[in-house]
Amino acid sequence: MAGLKNTSYNAVHWSQLAPEEQIRFWEDYEAGRATTFLVEPERKRTKRRRGEHSTKPKCENPSWYRPERYKALSGQLGHAYNRLVKKDPVTGEQSLRMHMSLHPFYVQKRTYAGRKYAFRPEKQRLLDTIWPVLVSFSDAVTHTVGMSVSRLAREISPKDSKGKVIPELEVTVSRLSRLLAEQVRFGVLGVSEETLWDRETRQRLPRYVWITPAGWQMLGVDMVKLHEQQQKRLRESEIRQQLIREGVLREDEDISVHAARKRWYLQRSQDALKHRRAKAAASKRARRLKKLPADQQIHEMAEYLRKRLPPDEAYFCSDDHLKRLAIRELRQLELTLAAPPPH
């Protein structure tokens, strides 16, 4: 038996075939073309071929721990982080205490999430790295991770001495996005309900994830205490106070976690739109000014700044000071000026 080819996964017995295929099988058997009663299914004809390129990720072994300058997490969030990460009392070196990729939950829900096999080693290491980041930047009110997927990818990517991401070793956004989408299918993460389309930049607005109760249970936190702490922070949250000021809520009314999370995401989307609009306007202004000579650039920028200064500040602003502001603004737009900046 050891020498036989294992065809139990892709071959079927002739009796399980359709009547027409059974007739064709016995014709082949009598003609000597069939030598076994197990029939392999006909493979689909496709032009797809395995390429010669490498499929290994740029960053095979990512690592991230909460920096010392960060304030320690309080309550059950701190308990969850301490269950994930341990610190050597002698050397102060941090390392993983719990590998989330080996949690039995992923084995139990494997079929439910659409997987057949366990995680590959490179995905295990990425999953072990991302969970401390998710807990570390989780909001105590909504349990929403305060970073978009692209910012999370930059956070865990290796950086050089200047703090910039090394392109050859980065954790790509697409790789992390696929991992988080799979965690959503497992039910341990939730994702923002809708992703708005920005017509100006032809890009979607950032997506945010939040840790579900199933995710917190995996981390081993006290769910009763976690709920009590969340409700307390929810009553004191700026989102609730803002709704009270707008007249949407009364002083004695509480806001649900779902409503607070939706309000939080709406605010983040508006902030992203404002930032993109300002960036697009600055880029358009830079392209227009780049065609002008240096002195004309300074004049145009000075007039632009004069119109946007507060009235009291514009009244006392001298031409020399306005010129310095214009040159500084032009250099921020990365325009090359012939004259050096004034000292």
UniProtKB/Swiss-Prot annotation:
InterPro entries: Plasmid_replication_init_RepA. Residues 42-61 are annotated as: Disordered. Signal peptide: none annotated. GO terms for biological process: DNA replication; plasmid maintenance. The keyword Disulfide bond does not apply. Keywords: DNA replication, Plasmid. It comes from the Bacteria. This is Replication initiation protein. It comes from Escherichia coli.
